Curated annotation (Swiss-Prot):
The gene is allB. Homotetramer. GO terms for biological process: allantoin catabolic process; purine nucleobase catabolic process. HAMAP family: Hydantoinase. Carboxylation allows a single lysine to coordinate two zinc ions. GO terms for molecular function: allantoinase activity; cobalt ion binding; zinc ion binding. It comes from Bacillus subtilis (strain 168). This is Allantoinase. Catalyzes the conversion of allantoin (5-ureidohydantoin) to allantoic acid by hydrolytic cleavage of the five-member hydantoin ring. The modification N6-carboxylysine is found at K147. It catalyses: (S)-allantoin + H2O = allantoate + H(+). InterPro entries: Allantoinase (IPR017593), Allantoinase_bact (IPR047604), Amidohydro-rel (IPR006680), DHOase/Allantoinase_Hydrolase (IPR050138), Metal-dep_hydrolase_composite (IPR011059), Metal_Hydrolase (IPR032466). Its cofactor is Zn(2+). Pfam families: Amidohydro_1.
Length: 446
């Protein structure tokens, strides 16, 4: 039988393990996976023993469009994600102007994505003071969930929530059948410590890290779990950086609460030492932790207590990455291209099965957010997959697809590389070359 595409000789990373297989694609969907399939195709791809992973589903990126396209934007951002093996990303509601806090804003943003994105995408709505009544209309317009900050967001347009807004908003999100994504750092702790340190003239990397201690994350997670008990709101804790907070989330799961947690590659690949040595390219919130805390977080991840890994790609204009005052420097790491590669580096260092990496980067987010046709190499799923070569790759400015090249990953050598990425059977990245065809669609739970 003739098909649109047949990938021959792949090491397919399936939920049941890695298998030697051919992958057959028809009409943008995986038609069959198996050994020595007798099928012809319009396009035959010889995988030559490369690993084939399900396309990454990154639940946490900031593309800043509309309004701050000079920071990133859908066009360069989606091409960057494709270069990293990502076939679906969730764009956050802040750093764009206007923030995505009404159904009108969400629908307008979705149309921009359709016009410019190389791969599929979802959109977070925002939970901010004064917009609780907009939650249900945004849910009906296609929001994948709602994002809130307990500490300052970094932009004036997207305000952090007070306790009443958080509680009422969580009740409304629960009623709408959606999920709250929470930036869990205590504003009381972080603002107070920053004031104390800045008043003493301490504004370097050590001062910044000291102003956002693990206790700020733990307090915010604990408080939100209590609100989840009261409201019944499902919660997804984003970019958790400390095992102490993960333990609270694990206990909440054991009590039957509907909670999940992500961490980011930079929290398991880098440490506070990198912020000291590299400066503002390593600034993020929560901050990179000590080497010991990093190792403990890795142990927690390997133990299965963290559901998924997302990039929290948060770029800016290079001029905003100041070195003279770490408090005033933009806090975000540009790294959306390196999630899968970073986790594969971790896998090889710690003997983590590749199917576990596929779970963290694809299957778990698909399951959590109801994307039933994504996240797995299985017949009937979207033909979203990435070919990985076990050839080392050193990140250069020329090989970065993000709009701006100021990144902690510059100069980093990964033990493997992305050879090609396919979204619904279309090649969207091939061996260092971006593919400019636009076919990204807004995805919603199915």
């Amino acid at each position: 039988m003739a098909y649109d595409m047949v990938i021959k000789g792949a090491k397919a990373v399936t939920p049941d393990g890695v298998i030697e297989a051919d992958i057959v694609v028809q009409n943008g969907v995986i038609a069959e996976i198996g050994s020595d399939i007798e099928a012809s195709g319009t396009e035959i791809i010889q995988a030559d023993g490369k690993y084939v992973f399900p396309g990454v589903i990154d639940c946490h990126v900031h593309f800043n469009e509309p309004g701050r396209e000079d920071w990133e934007g859908f066009e360069t951002g989606s091409q960057m994600m494709a270069a990293g093996g990502c076939t679906t990303y969730f764009d956050m509601p802040l750093n764009c102007i206007p923030s995505t806090v009404t159904a009108e804003h969400l629908l307008a943003k979705a149309e921009l994505g359709r016009q410019k994105s190389a791969v599929d995408f979802a959109l977070w709505g925002g939970l901010v003071p004064g917009h609780i009544e907009d939650i249900r209309p945004m849910a009906e317009a296609g929001a994948i969930g709602f994002k809130a900050f307990l500490s300052k967001s970094g932009t004036d347009e997207f305000r952090s929530v007070d306790e009443r807004t958080l509680l009422k908003g969580m009740a409304e999100i629960a009623a709408a059948g959606k999920i709250l994504a929470l930036h869990a750092e205590s504003d009381a702790i972080t603002s107070y410590l920053q004031m104390v340190l800045a008043n003493k003239g301490k504004v370097d990397a050590d001062a910044y890290a000291a102003s956002r201690p693990e206790e700020a994350e733990v307090e915010a997670v604990y408080r939100t779990i209590q609100y989840a008990k009261v409201t019944g709101c499902p919660v997804h804790f984003v970019h958790i950086s400390t095992a102490k907070a993960v333990r609270l989330i694990r206990e909440a799961k054991q009590e039957g609460l509907d909670v999940s947690v992500e961490t980011c590659p930079h929290y398991v690949l880098f440490s506070h030492d990198d912020l000291r040595q590299r400066g503002s390219v390593a600034k993020c919130a929560p901050p990179l932790r000590s080497r010991q805390s990093k190792e403990t977080l890795i142990e927690t991840l390997i133990a299965g207590d963290i559901d998924m890994v997302s990039s929290d790609h948060s770029p800016c204009r290079p001029s905003l990455k100041r070195e003279d005052n770490m408090f005033l420097s933009w806090g975000g790491i540009s790294g959306g291209q390196f999630t899968l590669l970073g986790m594969l580096e971790l896998a090889l260092e710690h003997q983590i099965p590749f199917e576990t990496i596929a779970e963290w980067t694809a299957a778990a987010p698909a399951k959590r957010f109801g994307l039933q046709k994504k996240g797995r190499l299985e017949a009937g799923c979207d033909a979203d997959f990435v070919l990985v070569s076990m050839e080392p790759y050193t990140v250069t400015r020329e090989s970065m697809f993000a709009k701006h090249k100021k990144s902690i990953y510059e100069g980093h050598t990964f033990p493997c590389s992305i050879s090609a990425t396919y979204s619904k059977g279309r090649c969207v990245y091939n061996d260092g070359e971006k593919v400019t065809e636009i076919d990204g669609a807004l995805v919603v739970p199915s």
